[in-house]
Amino acid sequence: MGVFLMKAVHFGAGNIGRGFIGELLFESGFETTFIDVVQPIIDYINASHSYEMYVIDNNYEKKVIKNVKAVSSITDEPAAVEAICEADIITTSVCVDNLDKIAPTLAKGLKERLNRGGSKVNVMACENAFYATDMLKKALVENKKAPITEAELDEIGAFPNVAVDRIALCKVVDGVKIPQIQSTFELVIEKDKMVDSTAQPIKGAEYVENLGMYLERKLYVFNCGHAATAYFGYYNNRATIFDALEVPEIKADVIAVMKESAMAMTKKYPFTFEELEAYIEKIIKRISLEELHDEVVRVGRSPIRKLNAKDRLVGPALLAEQYGLDNSHLAKAIAAGYAFDCKDDEQAVEIQNYIAENGIEKAVEKYSSLTAEHALYQKVIDAYKALKA
């Protein structure tokens, strides 16, 4: 391994860890230590201090990521602590539900780093959630196994939030999951919270002051369009997102949904409609790859969460209403969400049972917090009844 490489620590050697963040760290000149709990993946990485990944939309081109090693936080925590002490950057991709599980090891490492008089380090949670680094910091303070105070954390670390976006799948080869990723991605970092706000340690990332607008753009445009495709596709008996977007009417409806959302975003934030249109075009291209085999029931799953007033469909529809803009296609997508009756989805079953007992009006009130005083309320109900007619 190169002697002069900067050192990175990354928690989580899954699809996003190896296929996204790990690749960027390698391209940025870091030697990366992955901290994980899955022994076969740890052994696989350590066998050659490298790993393979494939780029889906480039004829599955193979890439080999080098200068890597892996340690188990279960069987070799001292090595994990040592790596944290020496790291020039620390990142995670373990899923937000697991941040409290990695907190003790990370807290122990940061505390030891502080005791040794180490330099301040950027710690970033690259998770698919709003303000995940804030959640990680909270988990560090609240963990009981390796106590560390917020003041100590601020002395030894900087905690910028990030927005992540990349489609990362995998295939199993000899019992190990090998990442298969799309070439396009977004990694947006809150620069004013970094140790040095002028530094750009990760190549290919964007460094911005107002992260909130980028997080909301992802939820209200990308996730919005993805969910709309799933619900329209399911209603029309299409198996995958690719199949759904092959139907011209569905594709037109999905683009109309995203444009309504985008128009509302231009009123709230300094985005131009043209740049959001380009973003929509990029998204449609990304999600309509046949090779993804992305099932509509997967993308549409957990409709209680997705039909919440602050989430991907009702959120932008209410924003459009607030600015007096058209949201009729968004209302139709919300209605399709209420018609999503997948038997294998607990939340879908709950919604369907509730509609059967109480009617769509009460369901929209309960799950989307919409009432008759919202113009959107009646639009959703009318659209739902039209779907059911």
Tell what function each PLM region has.
Residues 1-5:
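Short, Lys/Arg-enriched N-terminal segments with co-localized hydrophobic residues
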Residues 6-11, 15-389:
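Substrate/ligand-engaging "lid" and interaction regions
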